[in-house]
């Protein structure tokens, strides 16, 4: 399924073309004593989402998470740590992606930038709708993890 046989138009040799998942990052940005930052997307799919995006060639997933946080929220994040990896082929309606999710802290006031039409800081009891991609699953996993550790925000 992930590989197609093709023929070179110049030499006629057969070769394999792979259709691999695209690496992405998402970042759960904690604002102390307030909640987590979600962005309202400017582009399809429309709705609320965690800040995140595609990993650029030449950067690590950690660098991508820091860059995406800054690009979409204007926040400089600290204490970046990996949370989980999500790889459901249907997690993104545009294409098959695999995301590495990070958790980080930030201080200051976030402002929507880049692909964000708006943003907000939310607790588990004040989440906006609709939440796109599989981000509601990710957010629920995050809050359940916090609850299990007795650290609910």
Identify the function of each model-found stretch.
Residues 1-26:
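Acidic, metal-coordinating catalytic segment for phosphate/diphosphate chemistry
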Residues 7, 21, 46, 78, ...:
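Residue-level preference for beta-strand/loop junctions
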Residues 29-30, 38, 104, 121:
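Conserved hydrophobic "DFG−1" position in protein kinase catalytic cores
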Residues 31-72:
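Conserved Nudix-box catalytic region and its N-terminal flanking loop in Nudix hydrolases
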Residues 35, 77-80:
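Short acidic capping loops at alpha-helix termini that bridge into adjacent secondary structure
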Residues 55-78, 86-142, 153:
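Unchanged
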Residues 148:
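Long C-terminal interaction/binding lobes of large macromolecular proteins
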